Structures are given as structure tokens and as C-alpha cells.
Amino acid sequence: MGRGGKGGFCMIKLIASDMDGTILDGEGNVPPETFDLIKRLKTAGIGFVASSGRRFDTLQELFAPVSGEMDFVASNGAQVVVAGQLVDREVFSHAALRRLKNVTDLFDGLHLVVFDRKISYLLDDEERFERELDKNLPNPLRVRDLPRPDTSIIKVSIYVDDAVMDMAYILEREMGEDFVFAPSGRKWIDVMQRGVSKATGIKQVMEARHARAEEVVAFGDSMNDYEIMRMVGTSIAMGNGRSAIKEISTKVIGPNTEHAVQRELEALLSMMGK
């Protein structure tokens, strides 16, 4: 735990958590006790932020019982919602996406998905990949080419058949001037615009909520959490997380399959007498 010495919970104003592999269970669901924890945090004066590569509409659905009592950093920072209001939305350049598609087309094992506010555009005709997409991405639409230039693309991901780290390296070499490529899990690479990330989204929430970095706690497991984990006062890595995330974090807890985030939040509230 590379930064140590900041593991105590004091003067917390915001808690940000990643979703998949972090606060969600092994089946990709929000454990039921989470909703009560978020309500209790709000009563205690602590805001909760869902920080994810997922789109806002998906997160809003996941947290439906408490969606009006929390903030959202969605689509890896491209959608930021504070107190129910969209405060920022970053869209991808169509020309840059065209260049990215030309690169991914070189590799049979790379499958590109682009997202607008409602639709997941699957640029692939491989049936196995379509089944993978259907597992957890809403409104999938299989297409032969990028959507029209006037479509507001807010999120881009690449499904990788094998060797996700190698492919992230290749993509960084090919398109690093335009994008950041962050492995997410074993099969996905999140594509982020330069200057747009979960960390930039959290900074906007912090400004709106008047919270300093040392007053923010973040939970995460993957490389798309790296910047935010480095930025906040207390970073808590999952036991199932990537080694690099564990190394730079204040603390390492159990895996998401054991509801470790929920146990940590319960411990915080108990310590506060809430």
C-alpha cells in the first residue's frame, strides 16, 4: 500500500466508488444493503458518487431507489451529474473515431463499441461478441460503420479476445495522441479522450460540493481508476483489483464478491455513530 498513513476516516465529504469489480457483486448487481448505506451517508453529511465507465442512464437504473440522493461520474468522466443536473458532457470527435476504427479493423481480436446517450453501437458482426455485449450493455445495435457525424458519442470501449494488456499497449502506440486506453477487467479496454477521465469528473463534483482532495475517499479496482486513486486523500483498492492499483492505494480490502465496500462503509458509519 504505497501511500500509507492516510487510512483513517476523518473529515470526509465525498465517497466515490467504481462499479464493476468494486461496489457491484459478482453478478453485476448492487447489493441491496447499499441503498440504505447511501441514505445514511447523506444523513451524516457525506455525499456518495458513482464513478464508472457505464453510461449515466445505466447507473441511474442501477441506483434507482437512491438516484436522487447521490451524484454520478459516468462514461469515464464524459457525463457528470451533480444534484440531478448534468454539469458536463464531453463528446468524441468523429474524425478521431474514424482513425480509431481504422486501427481496430487491423486486428481480428479487437471489437469496437461506441455509445450515445441511449444506444450501444456494436461495430462487429461476430455472434460471440454480440452475446458478450448483450450481457450488460443496454440497447445494443449491430452496425457496419460508425454512426453519423452528428451523433453525440459519449463513450467508447473495445472488447478484446485475448491479451488485453498487449492490445492496450498497441493502441496507445497507434492512437496515444488522441486517446488514453485503460484496461477494464480481463476483456475490455476503455477509450478516453485526452483530458477527460473519472478524475476530471470527480474534480467537478468536488468543486460543486466544496470538497478538498483530502476530504474524498475513492474505491476502485481497475486501471481506469488510477488517476482518481492518486488524486484523493484516501484510496481503497479491492482485493480482486489490479496489482498497480493496490500498490498506490492507502488500503486494500476484500473482494467485491464479499461486499467489501459495503462492509467498509458500514464500519465508517458505525465509527461515526450513524
Where are these regions (language model features)?
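Conserved acidic, metal-coordinating active-site core of Asp-based
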Residues: 109-219, 223-228, 240
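Short, structured coil segments at secondary-structure junctions
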Residues: 65-68, 76, 174-177, 231-232, ...
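Mg2+-dependent phosphoryl-transfer enzymes with acidic/Ser/Thr/Gly-rich catalytic loops
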Residues: 10-14, 31, 190-274
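Active-site metal-binding loops of divalent metal-dependent hydrolases
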Residues: 19, 77, 220-222
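Short, acidic loop-to-helix structural element flanking the phosphoryl-transfer center
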Residues: 28-44, 89-96, 138-140, 195-207, ...
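Short active-site oxyanion
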Residues: 45-49, 68-70, 154-155, 214-215, ...
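Active-site phosphate-binding/coordination module
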Residues: 26-129
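Short, Lys/Arg-enriched N-terminal segments with co-localized hydrophobic residues
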Residues: 1-10
